[in-house]
From Swiss-Prot:
Gene Ontology molecular-function annotations: argininosuccinate synthase activity; ATP binding
Quaternary structure and partners: Homotetramer.
Top-level taxon of the source organism: Archaea
Lineage, uppermost ranks: Archaea, Methanobacteriati, Methanobacteriota, Stenosarchaea group, Methanomicrobia
Coiled coil: none
Official protein name in the record: Argininosuccinate synthase
Gene behind the chain: argG
Enzyme class: ligase
Documented EC number(s): 6.3.4.5
Residues reported to bind L-citrulline: Y86, S91, N122, R126, S172, S181, E257, Y269
InterPro entries, alphabetized: Arginosuc_syn_C (IPR048268), Arginosuc_syn_N (IPR048267), Arginosuc_synth (IPR001518), Arginosuc_synth_CS (IPR018223), Arginosuc_synth_type_1_subfam (IPR023434), AS_cat/multimer_dom_body (IPR024074), Rossmann-like_a/b/a_fold (IPR014729)
One of the record's GO cellular component terms: cytoplasm
PROSITE patterns linked to this entry: ARGININOSUCCIN_SYN_1, ARGININOSUCCIN_SYN_2
Amino acid sequence: MVKKVALAYSGGLDTSVCIPILKEKYGYDEVITISVDVGQPEEEIRKADAKAQKISNKHYTIDAKEEFVRDYIFPLIKANGNYEGYVMGTSVARPLIAKKVVEAAKKEGAIALAHGCTGKGNDQLRFEAVFRQTDMDVIAPMREMNLTREWEINYAKEHGIPVEATKSKPWSVDENIWSRSIEGGRLEDPSFVPPEEIFEWTKSAEDAPNEPRIVDIDFEAGVPVAIDGEKLGGYALVKKMNEIAGENGVGRTDMIEDRVLGLKARENYEHPAATVLLAAHADLEKLVLTRGELKFKKIVEEQWSEMAYAGLVDDPLFADLNAFIDKSQERVTGTVKVKLYKGALTILARSSPNALYSEDLVSFDSQTIDQKDAEGFAKYHGFQARMYRKVVGK
């Protein structure tokens, strides 16, 4: 029987060297590669396809862009998904990619699933949370062989595999429609200032336009549906916002991130659309949700983000959290006006047919509320603190 293994394939260094390794070191007869398009550059998809056609036994390229935005990004927006300041583009993409790999593996009759993740990062966990729901073997050559990037570069050259990474410029890039991450090489030194050349989606504040860009974003039930009055599909909307915000220098993050395993990592991200859409959505929520809803939702959001970051999207608790979030978003409909200027984002205004804000009630000139009625409340505000002072004698 022909032994087949299905490999999650990006076209990068790690997954490219996995192909000969799976044959030479693990004894598989055929390596089936699967690339999943979640918004990578078209050229990257084309190169991955061309490379895989030469070095793998069979290759799939699966278009999952709309599915990614609809089923992963929009729920993230509704949840105000954020892990330590990271918008989790890579985090939420991995489970979808893994599921597509499993589907292809079953179609091909593969007996094993493989990925090119290292033993130090989070992606191994995200892939395997999905892979291990099957009865197939799971293989992680990078982790199991304890490979270094330098070894991989040399191995690739020995096997005639073209790679873009070099020893002098070894950083790696992971990109989808929601975010672009740049890591590795000198970037791992937190004291090293990243060169401007690593950024592709965003202009520096110095190079951004000298005039601010004002944008209106329409939401329906927590989901962005239009930019400046133009209705757009999910993928098209995120793509357009990436272009608008990136042009104005909005959406860069340089951070120290706590990985699931406990390691701290220096990460550089570009996420223009995510920065704007998340800020606008959170602002609109403040207009339409009650104080109690907002307070409790923050607890839910933190748990949701922790689980999404770890790739635990198939956990029953994650479904429970989404059920609450979806219910909370039924009234989150309206428009938010933002200003983008030289790397800064400013919320200018917001409106909603479901607004709980009443200009008449809060106005200094309004007589709708009798101010004297607040006296009884004021008398007992801070009551326990006053009792404490009496008891301790201070």
